[in-house]
Amino acid sequence: SLDSVQVTLYSHDPAVHNALVGAEGFDDTVAGIRNAVAAGLSVSVNTPLCSLNTDYAATVRFVHELGVRYVTCSGLIPSGSAEGAESQATRLTEEQLTDVLRRAVTVAEELGMEMDFTSPGWLKEETLRSMGLTLVPSCGACLSNMAIAPDGGVIPCQSWLSSQPLGNILTDDWDKIWQSQRCAAIRAKSAKMEQLCQLRQGNGEEASVC
């Protein structure tokens, strides 16, 4: 049975959230968080950080008021629509990202919340540990996580939207997908635990599109 759920909320500000997702979805997203908390599920809220939501600490306070006790955040991953010039212009530098995260960690500690930063290679290990964050992220593509797109396409991780899927869960045998050459190659790189995002670094045939 379902016991946990993660919801992406870009901002406590409806206008910012809606602008970043390209739809008027803020109210439905917040309602979903409330419903999941009320149902007794373990709820985490993830926020990809960019120049439009540098007040992330306020978003942490907002989701705490909704009953959320665990939050994660990440850099803006260059995949799908985030590869465009307009999106690239909103990406934070390492220094900016560190400042945003440090302020949010302070709020999370004040409220007794747990927080993790999940983008491998974006911030140095010593930077994360200096904030008291114990999770040093590594890429889990095809290793600890994969994702299924709405059309059934199987992708290495939830952000890997730029290249052809590894297969389709509706029409292809799972073992064939899992043991395919592409899947195995991505998994082998993830297993090195190099604290690098394969989408940022480029990985074999993916380098031309990621």
Label for each model-derived stretch:
Residues D3-S4, T8-G140, N145, P150-V154, ...:
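Radical SAM enzyme [4Fe-4S]-AdoMet core and its adjacent flexible, acidic
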Residues R129-S130, V136, G153-C210:
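Flexible mid-to-C-terminal extensions adjoining Fe-S/redox cofactors in radical SAM and related proteins
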